[in-house]
Amino acid sequence: MAFGTDPTPDGLANPPIDDLMKHADSKYALAIFAAKRARQINSYFTQLNEGLLQNIGPLVEYQNNEKPLSIAFREIDEGLLEETLGEDDANEGN
């Protein structure tokens, strides 16, 4: 193992897309689900700097340089979130 490298890939490669698809009906639903959660996580970090806490922070351990979307995918993979599409989301793809 070379110094300075991480043996497990980050981002969309980890967790694998096949594992993530077990938690959503379609790739579209998974993308919407993860994007909404990533926006919540991003808002949480912004509010944390301002002293406001209106959103729920990450439900998994994370590193400071980790992107909100990667955190959201890991939360989905671990089954910590439940997917529900609203009317707007369900009709958006049509």
Curated annotation (Swiss-Prot):
GO molecular function ontology, one term from the record: DNA-directed RNA polymerase activity
GO cellular component, one term: DNA-directed RNA polymerase complex
Any one Gene Ontology BP term: DNA-templated transcription
Record Pfam families: RNA_pol_Rpb6
InterPro entries from the UniProt entry: DNA-dir_RNA_pol_omega, Pol_omega/Rpo6/RPB6, RPB6/omega-like_sf
Keywords assigned by UniProt, alphabetized: DNA-directed RNA polymerase, Nucleotidyltransferase, Transcription, Transferase
Coiled coil: none
Catalyzed reactions: RNA(n) + a ribonucleoside 5'-triphosphate = RNA(n+1) + diphosphate
Enzyme Commission number: 2.7.7.6
Subunit note: The RNAP catalytic core consists of 2 alpha, 1 beta, 1 beta' and 1 omega subunit. When a sigma factor is associated with the core the holoenzyme is formed, which can initiate transcription.
Physiological role: Promotes RNA polymerase assembly. Latches the N- and C-terminal regions of the beta' subunit thereby facilitating its interaction with the beta and alpha subunits.
Family the entry assigns: Belongs to the RNA polymerase subunit omega family.
UniProt xrefs under HAMAP family: RNApol_bact_RpoZ
Record's protein name: DNA-directed RNA polymerase subunit omega
Gene that encodes the chain: rpoZ
